[in-house]
């Protein structure tokens, strides 16, 4: 069933969450959906031959992806939705090591995470291998769908402070074990990718949990999954993008999923890179748009930065602003911050609220307590680059 004619399905969301075990895998999953919907891949290194009303996508680094629908008439503006492909995890620094009878691999933290949630659970590995071939270097996705590792907690007998506020040292406490000494993670991943260990030239690998997305609650009203931040929003906005029918002839539509939001978005595949501005420039050139027309079209745009927000924690309601309660199932959230770490202003908030009212979607307002700094996301970083 074409996505445009398909009702939103939690099972489809779960499939996307389960597939996105690394930024490379979530990008590949999104590309597969776009291909099935008739979008044509435009590699950045190739010449583009764009036509009015055409459907296209491009990727960068294999971990960021941007899809667009060309306007059918003279360009007048854009609708855009942005999210990110990465999630907090542990980046693997070394593939093979051993000590005290265990096979080991060194990791370092990626993004902001609750370290304690990584202990004592089955873990696997996901990402890409850069492999030597007869034709050069090839990128291969890899994800053994079985438990390969765990990060063992120190037992209570050796750590009496474990339940009273322990500070974890990631270099010491969060290093995983991969079985008994003598096993080789490099050999395992090479076999998984259909190659040889000696042909692996480099890797981009992370740890991932092995549990699948699932419903929870007495009525199945909630769900739990890894990587909800931000693949939930990535999938929801992709679904919405594919529902679009291009009612306005002069308006183009963009969906983008950047990488490296969790570490500041400053990479070439992040929101502070040139991916979106490069694509816009090539689209505008194909349409014969002048600089004047470009600026006018970009200012006639609504950019939605879609990332997760915080509902009231039932055990710690005092952590939320009680005057602005956000409840699970209460509707989408508009996030405001005086430090401008989100994109929402009075103008954009009003526009978004009006759109939601028309669609019958409830809207909640979120702001941190005045004594809590809160987080940030990519929208404000992107908006200042492309004037949207």
Q: Model regions: which residues?
A:
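N-terminal hydrophobic/helix-forming segments and targeting peptides
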Residues: 2-388
């Amino acid at each position: 069933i074409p996505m445009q004619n398909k009702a939103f399905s939690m099972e489809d969301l779960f499939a996307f969450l389960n597939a996105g075990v690394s930024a490379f895998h979530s990008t590949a999953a999104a590309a597969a959906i776009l291909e099935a919907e008739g979008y044509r891949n435009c590699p950045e290194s190739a010449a583009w031959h764009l036509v009015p009303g055409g459907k296209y996508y491009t990727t960068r680094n294999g971990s960021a992806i941007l899809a667009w629908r060309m306007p059918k008439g003279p360009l007048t503006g854009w609708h855009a939705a942005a999210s990110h492909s990465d999630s907090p995890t542990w980046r693997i620094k070394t593939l093979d090591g051993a000590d005290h009878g265990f096979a080991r691999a060194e990791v370092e933290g990626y993004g902001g995470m609750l370290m304690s949630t990584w202990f004592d659970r089955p873990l696997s590995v996901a990402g890409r291998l850069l492999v030597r071939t007869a034709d050069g270097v090839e990128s291969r996705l890899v994800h053994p769908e079985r438990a390969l590792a765990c990060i063992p907690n120190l037992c209570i007998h050796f750590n009496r402070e474990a339940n009273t506020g322990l500070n974890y040292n990631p270099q010491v406490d969060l290093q995983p074990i991969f079985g008994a000494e003598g096993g080789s993670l490099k050999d395992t991943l090479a076999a998984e990718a259909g190659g040889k260990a000696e042909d692996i030239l480099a890797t981009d690998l992370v740890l991932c949990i092995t549990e699948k997305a699932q419903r929870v609650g007495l009525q199945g009203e909630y769900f739990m999954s890894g990587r909800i931040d931000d693949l939930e929003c990535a999938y929801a906005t992709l679904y919405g993008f594919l529902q679009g029918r291009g009612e306005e002839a002069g308006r183009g539509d963009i969906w983008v999923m950047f990488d490296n939001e969790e570490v500041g978005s400053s990479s070439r595949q992040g929101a502070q890179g040139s991916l979106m501005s490069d694509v816009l420039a090539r689209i505008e050139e194909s349409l014969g748009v002048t600089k004047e027309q470009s600026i006018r079209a970009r200012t006639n745009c609504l950019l939605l930065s879609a990332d997760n927000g915080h509902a009231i924690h039932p055990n710690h309601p005092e952590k939320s602003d009680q005057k602005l309660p956000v409840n699970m199932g209460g509707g989408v959230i508009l996030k405001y911050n005086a430090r401008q770490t989100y994109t929402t202003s009075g103008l954009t908030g009003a526009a978004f609220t009006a759109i939601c009212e028309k669609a019958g979607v409830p809207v909640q307002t979120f702001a941190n307590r005045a004594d809590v700094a809160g987080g940030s996301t990519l929208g404000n970083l992107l908006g200042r680059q492309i004037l949207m």
